[in-house]
Amino acid sequence: MKKIILLFSLIVLIGCKSKKPDTTTEAIPEVVTFVRLTTTEVDANLKTKAYQLGKRILMTCNTSKFKPFNKSEATRSVIDNITEEKLSKTCAKFRQRYGDFKDLKLMQIYKDNETRTTIFRYKALYTKAVANKELRVYMNDQSQVSAIKSMDWSDTFERKLFRNTDTDTE
């Protein structure tokens, strides 16, 4: 009989679920790294410089002449990566699909507080109506182009793979 009571007690003890402590996890506040800026919040010289450098890249498609960036205009990685050969290949595709480049229209400006980069979103205007392209010019805190990216235009801003800016100042 003692064995049956002991076995029954053991089964009851194992069968009882222990009550989990009521732990509430605090919601970690989401860190906002991108802030949309108005055109008046950005220095006029920086806007002009971003526009001119972005336009210089796309005008290469019309003129076939590219003036390379210097150290005061762009970071070392941008200078090394933008070559006349690479631009020629890209321009050949763009001219065939979209026609001649006309101009850039500034649509939005964002500040990435994590990398201290100002991102200028331009809509690239071409002669063919089917063209719906975006040119992003990333300017670091030394007013240098740290990246340039061309993609299809989207009304919503997305990070689009660019993470690490080159911050050399040589």
Predicted regions and their residues:
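Positively charged n-region of N-terminal signal peptides that target proteins for export
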Residues: M1-I4
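C-terminal motif of bacterial Sec signal peptides marking the signal peptidase cleavage site
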Residues: I14-G15
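Short, low-complexity N-terminal intrinsically disordered segments enriched in polar/charged residues
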Residues: K19-T63
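Short secondary-structure boundary micro-motifs
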Residues: V42-A44, N62, A92-F94, L106-I109, ...
